[in-house]
C-alpha cells in the first residue's frame, strides 16, 4: 500500500540522520516515544497534529516529506486545529484530509494586490497554492480561509485556493472554502483543467467561484458577500469547456448577482435553488471580452428562486450545443468522458460519500439501477440501509461499494444510507434520496442520470 511505503521511506530517512525521535525543524517535531501517531486502523500515510501527537506539527513539512511521486494517492490526515500557515503543493496524487470539516482549519491572510507588489506572479498569493502541473489533488473534510478582509479591511481579490498551468483532476469534497474577498477558489488551467466539487460550501466576494476549463459542482452551497457576481467561468480555449452546477443552493447579501463573464464562458445550472436575496439580473458580460468566439452561454433546468421566479432562468437546455437532456448531465458528461471522478476517486473521507444516483436524483430507472458510492478511508465493509421511509431500514452488509436493490416501484421516492464499518466501530453516513421514473415520477424536468 502507498501509505506503508511512505512511512518506510520517512522512517528510514529519520533514522539515517539521527532524528528518532528528535525534532525536524522545530515546530515540525515528530511524536514523542510512546505516543502513537497512527491508530491501528488508520490508513493515512502521514498525520499532522499541532499538539505534537502526529508525524508533523505543520502541513508544509508533511507535504515536503512525501516522495516526489507515487502510483497512488498519498493521504495526509490533519488533526483538528487551526493551522495558520500558507501551503505549497508541488506533488501530484496527494489528498489533504481534515479530521473534521469545521474544526480543521487552514487560515492565512494575503491580498493579491499586495503580494504582486513584490512578486512577479501569484505563486504564494493563496492559502493553498497548487503548483503548475499538479494532478489528482484532493482537498477534503476541512476549512480553508483567506481572512485578509476581516483583518486588513479590503475585500479585493484574495485567494483561498489557486492553481495554474497544467493542473487537473482537482477535487474538493465536503469542505468549506472561504475568502473575505474575491476569487476565493481559482483553479486556473484554462487549457486542460478538470475540477470536481461535491458537498462543499464556497463564500466570498466578486467572482468567488471562478474556474477556467471544465468544472463540475454538486450538492453544494454558495454565499456571495458582494453584489457584483458569485460565479465566473473562462471557457475561452475550447468550445466544450463548461461550468456545471447541479443540486446546489445560492444565497448572499440582498441584491447579489448570480454570475458574469469577461471572456467566453459556458454555464449549466440544474436543480439549483436561489434565495430571495438574488437580484433579477441574468448572467452578464462585465466588459468587452478579451476573447469572444462563442458568446455568453447560460443554460438552466428546473431552477427555482424563493418567492418570485425570474424568466431568465427558465428551462432552456434545448438551446445548448447538442441539446443535452437533463438525465445525461453529470460529472462524466461534463468532462467529455476523460474523467469520471464519481467512479474513481480514492477513499479519503471517514464516511461513505458521492452517491450514485446522486442525492435528489429524479427519473432513476426502476429496472436495472444499482446504488454505488465512494468508500470510507477505514472501512472494511458497509451497512446499507434502503427503503421508502426516512430513516431507511438496514437491508445488507456488503464488502464493496455497490448494492443491487432489485426492481423498484416507478414514481416512488427512495431513501438510502451507507454506514462505514471500521475496526473502531460504525461511521454513520448521510441519508440520500432519489425518485424513480414512471407514472408519478415522470421523466421531465429535474431528470437525473442514475448510473454516472
Task: Please provide the spans of the model-predicted regions.
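Extracellular low-complexity, O-glycosylation-prone stalks/linkers
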Residues: 379-392
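Conserved aromatic anchor
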Residues: 368-378
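Extracellular fibronectin type III
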Residues: 410, 423-439
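N-terminal secretory signal peptides and thylakoid transit peptides that target proteins
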Residues: 2-17
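Surface-exposed, short loops/turns at beta-strand junctions within beta-sandwich domains
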Residues: 406-413
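Sequence-level preference for short, compositionally simple segments enriched
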Residues: 30-350
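Short beta-strand segments within Ig-like beta-sandwich modules, predominantly Fibronectin type-III
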Residues: 394-399
Amino acid at each position: 500500500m502507498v501509505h506503508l511505503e511512505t512511512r518506510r521511506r520517512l522512517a528510514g530517512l529519520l533514522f539515517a540522520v539521527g532524528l528518532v525521535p528528535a525534532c525536524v525543524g522545530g515546530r515540525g517535531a515528530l511524536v514523542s516515544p510512546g505516543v502513537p501517531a497512527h491508530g491501528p486502523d488508520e490508513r493515512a500515510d502521514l498525520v499532522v497534529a499541532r499538539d505534537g501527537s502526529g508525524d508533523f506539527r505543520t502541513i508544509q513539512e508533511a507535504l515536503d516529506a512525501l516522495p516526489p511521486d507515487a502510483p497512488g494517492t498519498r493521504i495526509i490526515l490533519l488533526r483538528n486545529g487551526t493551522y495558520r500557515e500558507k501551503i505549497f503543493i508541488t506533488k501530484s496524487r496527494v489528498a489533504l484530509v481534515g479530521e473534521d470539516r469545521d474544526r480543521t482549519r487552514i487560515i492565512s491572510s494575503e491580498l493579491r494586490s499586495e503580494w504582486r507588489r513584490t512578486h512577479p506572479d501569484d505563486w504564494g498569493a493563496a492559502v493553498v497554492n497548487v503548483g503548475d502541473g499538479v494532478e489528482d489533488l484532493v482537498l477534503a473534510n476541512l476549512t480553508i480561509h483567506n481572512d485578509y478582509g476581516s483583518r486588513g479591511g479590503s475585500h479585493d481579490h484574495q485567494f483561498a485556493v489557486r492553481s495554474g498551468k497544467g493542473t487537473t483532476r482537482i477535487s474538493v469534497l465536503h469542505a468549506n472554502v472561504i475568502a473575505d474577498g474575491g476569487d476565493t477558489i481559482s483553479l486556473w488551467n484554462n487549457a486542460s483543467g478538470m475540477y470536481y466539487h461535491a458537498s462543499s460550501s464556497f463564500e466570498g466576494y466578486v467572482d468567488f467561484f471562478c474556474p477556467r476549463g471544465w468544472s463540475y459542482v454538486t450538492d453544494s452551497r454558495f454565499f456571495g458577500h458582494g453584489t457584483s457576481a458569485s460565479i465566473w467561468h473562462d471557457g475561452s480555449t475550447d468550445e466544450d469547456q463548461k461550468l456545471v452546477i447541479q443540486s446546489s443552493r445560492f444565497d448572499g447579501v440582498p441584491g447579489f448577482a448570480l454570475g458574469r463573464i469577461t471572456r467566453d464562458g459556458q454555464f449549466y445550472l440544474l436543480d439549483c435553488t436561489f434565495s430571495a436575496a438574488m437580484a433579477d439580473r441574468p448572467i452578464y458580460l462585465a466588459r468587452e471580452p478579451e476573447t469572444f468566439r462563442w458568446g455568453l452561454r447560460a443554460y438552466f433546468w428546473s431552477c427555482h428562486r424563493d418567492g418570485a421566479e425570474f424568466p431568465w432562468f427558465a428551462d432552456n437546455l434545448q438551446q445548448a450545443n447538442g441539446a443535452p437532456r437533463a438525465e445525461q448531465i453529470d460529472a462524466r458528461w461534463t468532462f467529455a468522458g476523460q474523467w469520471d471522478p464519481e467512479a474513481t476517486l480514492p477513499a479519503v473521507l471517514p464516511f461513505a460519500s458521492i452517491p450514485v444516483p446522486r442525492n435528489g436524483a429524479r427519473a432513476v430507472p426502476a429496472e436495472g439501477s444499482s446504488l454505488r458510492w465512494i468508500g470510507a478511508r477505514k472501512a472494511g465493509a458497509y451497512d446499507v440501509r434502503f427503503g421508502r421511509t426516512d430513516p431507511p431500514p438496514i437491508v445488507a452488509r456488503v464488502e464493496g461499494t455497490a448494492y443491487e436493490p432489485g426492481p423498484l416501484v416507478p414514481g416512488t421516492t427512495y431513501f438510502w444510507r451507507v454506514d462505514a464499518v471500521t475496526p473502531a466501530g460504525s461511521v454513520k453516513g448521510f441519508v440520500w434520496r432519489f425518485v424513480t421514473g414512471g407514472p408519478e415520477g415522470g421523466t421531465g424536468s429535474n431528470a437525473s442520470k442514475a448510473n454516472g
